[in-house]
A protein has these predicted regions:
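Short acidic/polar capping segments at secondary-structure boundaries
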Residues: 78, 119-121, 144
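Short acidic capping loops at alpha-helix termini that bridge into adjacent secondary structure
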Residues: 108-110, 141-142
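Metal-dependent catalytic neighborhoods of phosphoester/phosphodiester hydrolases
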Residues: 124-134
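Short, conserved loop/helix-junction motifs that constitute active-site signature segments
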Residues: 133-141
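Short internal beta-strands
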Residues: 140-148
Length: 148
């Protein structure tokens, strides 16, 4: 099921969603239509939406399995969170991410480490989940690793 095999290490992409984000002009300072025209043969329709002109980004984690540990790199957007700047992420109720993690053969209790590359909302959202009105760790047996 691994997307990549590096020796005896398996790496699997765990997708939460494909999301339209911003236009190339909004994201890249100085980006011009001519720059887009030079690359539209491979950007359309999978990386840029033909209808909106927005970039299509995979919101995903990487599941890393070694002989000794099960590691999750980033935890996507999550559910029941409040986001003012990305309305589509506000108060989501979709458990696709957890279902995809289980489809990859891992239960949240089996994660040993969660590596957070940085603390943007689309990288740490599933660090916690709402359960019976309380925020609890989604990966209760994991050690969470952050940079200083």
């Amino acid at each position: 099921m691994a997307d990549w095999q590096l020796g005896d290490i398996e790496v699997t992409s765990v997708l939460e969603q494909m999301a339209e984000f911003m236009t190339l002009e909004e994201f890249f300072d100085g980006f011009t239509p001519e720059m887009f025209d030079a690359h539209k043969d491979w950007l359309l329709p999978n990386a840029v939406s033909p209808s909106s002109g927005k970039m299509i980004l995979p919101i995903q984690s990487y599941l890393v399995r070694t002989k000794h540990h099960t590691i999750l790199i980033d935890t996507c957007v999550g559910c029941h969170k409040k986001f003012k700047w990305v309305p589509d992420w506000n108060d989501r109720r979709d458990d696709t991410y957890l279902r995809n993690l289980k489809a990859a053969g891992v239960d949240p209790t089996e994660i040993d480490y969660v590596f957070c590359t940085h603390l943007h909302v689309d990288h740490c959202g599933w660090n916690t989940k709402l359960e019976d009105g309380r925020w609890v760790p989604t990966f209760p047996n994991a050690k969470y690793i952050f940079s200083q």
